[in-house]
């Protein structure tokens, strides 16, 4: 897949996922319950152990619905975190030449204006202020911010409310998705490096 295709395809997937989360949060309490019940029925029909637990009161229906909803939250944001990471990484790669030129110019400027004893600290500080160097951290941070706006959105949806617990679950899901994506890419990069030797 070419860089130009990546520049269109990945952002489109990211926007679609953000809109999907927004749409799911726009459902009222009744619609949300109906969706959860569909998943619960599917699980009960296809997993005998779960059905046995419900029939023998080993697990309550409300607990199962709660687990289904929170798993959905986790999964939605795992996908979002992964897409944020891929988009940030792609942006970084496509702008690598510009970034290197900028760093070179910054170093030259600091060399002229900053004593040698302070040059290393100044360059290090400049690097820390460049968040795109850290797509993993930024993808988790952006997912957290989106989770916050999602909970604020739910305040205005009938029957829904904002819960800090959901923000934590969403952020945990985003962290999982972004980290797994990062590790997979790193693993394939190592395999490719070894095969070239």
Per-region residue spans from a language model:
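"…centered on the first transmembrane helix and the immediately adjacent amphipathic helix/loop
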Residues: 2-86
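Membrane-interfacial segments
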Residues: 87-96, 153-157, 161, 184, ...
């Amino acid at each position: 897949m070419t860089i130009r295709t990546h520049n269109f395809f990945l952002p489109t997937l990211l926007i679609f996922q953000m809109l999907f989360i927004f749409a799911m949060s726009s459902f009222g309490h009744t619609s949300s319950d109906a969706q959860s019940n569909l998943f619960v029925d599917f699980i009960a029909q296809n997993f005998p152990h779960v059905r046995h637990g419900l029939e023998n009161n080993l697990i309550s229906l409300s607990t199962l619905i709660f687990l289904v909803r929170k798993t959905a939250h986790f999964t939605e944001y795992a996908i979002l975190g992964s897409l944020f990471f891929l988009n940030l990484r792609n942006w970084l790669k496509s702008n690598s030449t510009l970034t290197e030129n900028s760093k070179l110019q910054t170093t030259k400027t600091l060399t002229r204006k900053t004593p040698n004893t302070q040059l290393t600290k100044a360059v290090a500080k400049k690097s820390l202020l460049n968040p795109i160097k850290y797509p993993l951290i930024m993808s988790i941070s952006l997912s957290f911010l989106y989770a916050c706006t999602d909970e604020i959105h739910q305040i205005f949806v009938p029957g829904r409310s904002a819960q800090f617990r959901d923000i934590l679950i969403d952020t945990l899901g985003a962290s999982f998705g972004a980290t797994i994506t990062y590790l997979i890419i790193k693993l394939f990069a190592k395999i490719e490096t070894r095969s070239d030797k």
